[in-house]
């Protein structure tokens, strides 16, 4: 239940956040959070479902120390978003793989730590960094039954 609520909350942010921008959609968006294991991959998957190939969408984390969260996979599957093939990566790994921050039109930070890191990494670029405060649902210590 909690993960489903978090997914729907993120879904609403994706719709409202993009629709509240100017009339033209950004060509590329990077979502970021702490570990790239729950919030940012969910946002990436939802945006790809909503906009297909209209917008280049990627995600990254401040660090890469976790695998994609199983509950995030399950909840997104319920709304037709595929996350099981997602591989977590950090900002540094993203750059090493050829996705440089300067190539994005918009960075959406979903946690305070990712906002700080995104601002540090983009201080020399003309790049917008937005902060959408999304609580990390994994920090809620509830049972599997309650989360599902």
Where are these regions (language model features)?
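Positively charged N-terminal leader segments that act as targeting/secretion signals
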Residues: 2-6
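Intrinsic-disorder-associated, low-complexity terminal segments enriched in Asp/Asn/His/Tyr and depleted
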Residues: 9, 19-20
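Short polar/charged helix/loop
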Residues: 22-148
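A periodicity- and composition-biased signal for non-globular, repetitive helical segments
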Residues: 9-10, 45
């Amino acid at each position: 239940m909690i993960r489903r609520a978090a997914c729907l909350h993120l879904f609403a942010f994706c719709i409202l956040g993009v629709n509240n921008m100017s009339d033209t959609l950004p060509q590329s968006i990077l979502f970021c959070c702490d570990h790239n294991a729950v919030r940012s991959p969910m946002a990436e998957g939802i945006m790809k479902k909503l906009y297909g190939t209209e917008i280049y969408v990627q995600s990254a984390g401040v660090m890469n120390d976790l695998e994609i969260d199983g509950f995030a996979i399950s909840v997104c599957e319920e709304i037709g978003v595929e996350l099981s093939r997602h591989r977590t990566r950090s900002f540094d790994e993203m750059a090493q793989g050829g996705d440089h921050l300067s190539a994005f039109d918009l960075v959406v930070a979903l946690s305070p730590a990712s906002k700080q890191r995104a601002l540090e990494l983009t201080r020399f670029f003309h790049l917008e960094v937005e902060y959408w405060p999304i609580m990390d649902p994994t920090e809620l210590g509830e049972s599997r039954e309650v989360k599902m």
